[in-house]
Amino acid sequence: LLLHSIHEPHIAYQDSVSKNNEIEGEFDVILANPPFTGSVNKSTISESLTNICSTTKTELLFVALFLRMLKKGGRCACIVPDGVLFGSSNAHKALRKELVENHQLQAVISMPSGVFKPYAGVSTGILIFTKTGAGGTDNVWFYDMKADGYSLDDKRQPIEANDIPDIIERYHNLEKETDRKRTEQSFFVPKAEIVQNNY
């Protein structure tokens, strides 16, 4: 923080999903890589989070927390394990429904397992959404990342294959993505189809 001329940072040491964290509607942008797995004691969880999705799983609670902490119109890009994207529990579906119905889920970028090796080998994705409180999801852009410029083994050596520049280019030109087929690396899925598949 000192390198960015922040001489008096506000740093709080607390459990972010607990009742002690009362931050609400304060941030314009949240970029996050929260803990992937784990559960917390139900009695300590903030009720405002369990109202969105009744669970003790941190991977879901953190996304609910980001929604609470954003200002209306605030944007978030967060890394989540695949379970958040494809989990079939009521809590998983409730969180996805919240994003699709009450906010604007803009993009889901699937990343290959190995991008966080040697620390974690789980498959992950990036959720990009805007807090609206009034919906706004019409189509969701999906991108299937195959490579990030590094080998997907424990060594993570630099390699030539890297989808990140392509992701950025396509994301900034989404109007060119509308006619892509589902067999391509990126494509849109209409909200109606997401709803039909139970989110």
Name each model-derived stretch.
Residues 18-199:
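A conserved structural/catalytic subdomain of Rossmann-like adenosyl-cofactor enzymes
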